[in-house]
Amino acid sequence: MGLTVISFILGTTAELIKIAPVYHGIAERGLRPKIWFTAQHIGEVADVLADLNMPEPDVWLVPKETAHGLETPAQVPGWAATVARNAWNRRAELRAALTEDGRPPLVLVHGDTFTTPYGSLIGKRILKARVGHIEAGARSGSILSPLPEELNRKIAAKIVDMHFAPSAREVNNLRNARGVVVDTEANTAIDAMRLAIDGPVDLSGLPEKFGLATLHRFELVSRGEKYREALEILRDQSRQMPILYMAGAPERERIKALGLENLFDEKNFIIRPKLRYLKFLPLAARAEYIVTDSGGLAAECFYLGLPCAVHRERTESPQHLGETVMLTEMRGDKLQNFLDTYQSRRGENWMEKYHPSDIIVKTLAQLGYC
């Protein structure tokens, strides 16, 4: 048996986290999948890979020594051109890697980042491989909300050959798609969560009870008044129980530009740097509630039964909405309503019910890929 037939084209730490259970499932069958990395995000990539017991990327489609990650939309065209140019220049090498064991070549992409459609195009058009999309079929119903994620998903759906959809709703969204559509019953995030949920957590300096917030999407932070409104509501709420706001460098720069640093203190509304997944999830699981604009974190809250407000206008995952996970439509009054009622919103824990990565790996095995 050769070393590999499957390559993941990925670009963010979130993608690495969510494909980790699939990667390990394939490896358990005697193959060693490859990771080709677009460097859409590079912060803490090496640490995240080490946390997940995964190797360094086999190929950097943006040279590692010059990679700096995407921080603004204006950087996307140059990044995309670099990725495409390197994939084209190395096409013979990449094709050889995909076919070295004689099985059908396969590229896997994930989710809805810029890397998702670009990886699909590289796999299909440049490398002439079959392409599978993990977490396929999510739709918000609006190209503009969220932008660019909704567009990325739709482009990928037109290219790929296999769609691994996390629920019957996404399967239905793909009813006219070409290729194979597989219902994995849940997001692979639930499998990644099992790798992290019981890990150690540093609670030193934190209050016994706290809420936790992460707000980072372009559609929110680019709209100064909406971002200000959300942070002011959280600041006011933190006087009742402290709130920990996990902010990356772009959010901190935006807070500074809007003159909002004075909202935060070290007692009630506490700002902290983002944590790696294996450190963040155990912390989040101990929060009383979550306020986020992350679809992935909202799904994790659903699986944990942890009260969560999704501060977005629309969501591509309405199947997670209900008493536990609430969509605010980016309205301040709805966010406040959640904060007033979160104590009654704790739901059922689904952690042991779903195993989507097993379904994906078994499907790939049945199709002769592993």
Regions found by a protein language model. Give the residues of each.
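Conserved nucleotide-sugar phosphate-binding/catalytic loop shared by glycosyltransferases and other
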Residues: L31-N86, R90
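Donor-nucleotide binding loops and adjacent catalytic segments primarily
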Residues: H41-G43, V48, G199-R286
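A short, histidine- and acid-enriched strand-loop-helix "catalytic/donor-clamping" loop
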Residues: G132-L147
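Short N-terminal targeting/anchoring amphipathic segment
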Residues: A92-F114
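A nucleotide-sugar donor-handling region in carbohydrate enzymes
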Residues: W36-T38, I42-G43, A156-G224
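A donor-sugar binding/catalytic signature common to diverse glycosyltransferases
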Residues: V109-H110, P117-L121, I134, H163, ...
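Leloir-type glycosyltransferase catalytic cores
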Residues: M326-C370
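N-terminal subdomain of nucleotide-sugar transferases
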Residues: M1-A39
